[in-house]
């Protein structure tokens, strides 16, 4: 099994966490990488075995308008400091993944500066898409060009140009040689050229054993991107939507159907599971009942896939988009403000417990998913491996509920694995004639380990 198959990710948006200037002023936040290292240590303490950190490299503003792929953003520090950060993570047993923003660059990228200066005679004009010297734009460049999402700040690269491909391939080799990273999250993979991604997979197989490629894909048939020829997996935005809307609408059918469909569609490829990230609002701002944060955390860790936590979400923090700005989703935080959270905060307590369980119980990672009971307000499924099983039980209703289902394995009793978490409630179970009954409190969820 590759390292990423049983990984638990911790996602850090470093420019936000460290409180960097929103526009690059070239000034480093003092001690930024010391702070990032402390957060990576915290992630290890709650069971996260991999750090996804990004965007990381020199840019003009939010990190995705890249200026220099081979220079750590000066607002954060230096290449040497990032190299040390990776080494410290590796010493703790954590892998490190960075953002690969290969679809577009910022306007200060060297090749685009050449295009602005030399127009039709530019050495690098073919590095960009849809360049039209008869057009113009809001910057009054005297030409127009392809972009991402309608934003001319993000200049679309021509990934079918062999020079562009080789430039990116060499960048990845540099990242591995210089920093010893373990993989890449491909930004905007849903608009990347497929042949380019095939080339990335061939390169990944060469640069480092088990070098990992994850693609940011919102909609579509995920198996087009996640397959043996291209990416190892993609982001599961389809489930992300179902996780919060399925609770708001009291509709577990949405979540169960999504998982069944995706497992069949992707041939059991493990997708990247998340409840929130740097682009979407935090759970407390999307849920009608914040008690359901517990349910969603449990689902992210127990459904088929690779779980992740976005920094701060383990503390239940809020984050809501403002008009034209995602910065409220990417706040500056201090660990010292959460020093007692694991023993006082119900959200932190359950995330820490889930991290421990994920490490201790292989059935939660590799076990077959067996659906046991499904209604609009109640959901029960098991993860079964080698005769052992953990049963996940959830009730999103405002009244207590009784679940009853066939036991997935032979058992005589059940242990509540989350009974010691902050805010835990008693769950009554009984077994008879191969069937199990569970009495669940209202708006409550837990994991039961079956025992013979």
Where are these regions (language model features)?
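Short catalytic-loop micro-motif centered on adjacent basic/acidic residues
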Residues: 97-98, 183-189, 283-284
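Active-site groove signature of glycoside hydrolases
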Residues: 104, 168-194, 273, 277
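C-terminal beta-strand-rich structural cap/linker in extracellular carbohydrate-active enzymes
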Residues: 430-452
């Amino acid at each position: 099994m590759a390292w990423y198959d049983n990984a638990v990710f911790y996602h850090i948006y470093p420019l936000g966490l460290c409180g960097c200037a929103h526009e690059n002023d070239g000034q480093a936040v003092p001690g930024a990488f010391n702070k990032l290292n402390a957060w990576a240590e915290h992630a290890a303490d709650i069971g996260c075995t991999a750090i996804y950190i990004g965007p990381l490299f020199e840019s003009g503003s939010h990190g995705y308008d890249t200026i220099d792929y081979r220079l750590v953003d000066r607002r954060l520090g230096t290449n040497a400091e990032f190299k040390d950060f990776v080494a410290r993570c590796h010493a703790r047993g954590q892998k490190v993944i960075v953002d690969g923003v290969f679809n577009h660059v910022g306007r200060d990228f060297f090749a685009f500066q050449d295009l602005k200066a030399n127009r039709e005679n530019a050495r690098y004009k073919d590095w960009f898409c849809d360049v039209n010297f008869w057009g113009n734009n809001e910057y009054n460049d005297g030409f127009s060009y392809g972009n991402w999402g309608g934003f001319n700040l993000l200049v679309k690269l021509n990934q079918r140009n062999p020079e562009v491909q080789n430039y990116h391939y060499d960048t990845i080799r540099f990242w591995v040689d210089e920093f010893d990273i373990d993989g890449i999250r491909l930004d905007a993979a849903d608009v990347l050229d497929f042949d380019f991604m095939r080339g990335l997979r061939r390169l990944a197989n060469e640069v480092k054993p088990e070098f990992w490629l994850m693609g940011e894909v919102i909609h579509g048939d995920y198996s087009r991107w996640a397959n043996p020829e291209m990416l190892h997996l993609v982001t599961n935005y389809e489930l992300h939507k179902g996780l919060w809307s399925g609770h708001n609408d009291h509709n577990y059918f949405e979540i169960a159907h999504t998982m069944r469909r995706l497992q069949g569609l992707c041939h059991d490829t493990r997708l990247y599971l998340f409840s929130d990230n740097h682009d979407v609002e935090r759970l407390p701002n999307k849920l009608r009942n914040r008690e359901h944060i517990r349910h969603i955390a449990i689902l992210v860790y127990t459904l088929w896939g690779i779980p992740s936590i976005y920094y701060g979400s383990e503390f239940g923090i809020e984050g809501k988009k403002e008009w034209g700005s995602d910065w409220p989703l990417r706040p500056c935080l201090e660990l010292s403000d959460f020093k007692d959270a694991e023993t006082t905060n119900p959200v932190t307590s359950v995330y820490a417990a889930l991290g421990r369980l994920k490490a201790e119980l292989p059935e939660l990672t590799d076990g077959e998913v067996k659906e046991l009971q499904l209604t609009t307000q109640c959901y029960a499924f098991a993860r079964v491996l080698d005769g052992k099983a953990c049963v996940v039980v959830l009730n999103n209703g405002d009244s207590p509920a009784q679940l009853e289902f066939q036991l997935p394995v032979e058992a005589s009793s059940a242990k509540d694995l989350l009974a010691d978490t902050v805010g835990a409630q008693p769950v009554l179970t009984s077994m008879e004639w191969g069937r199990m009954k569970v009495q669940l409190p209202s708006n409550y969820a837990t994991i039961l380990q079956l025992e013979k």
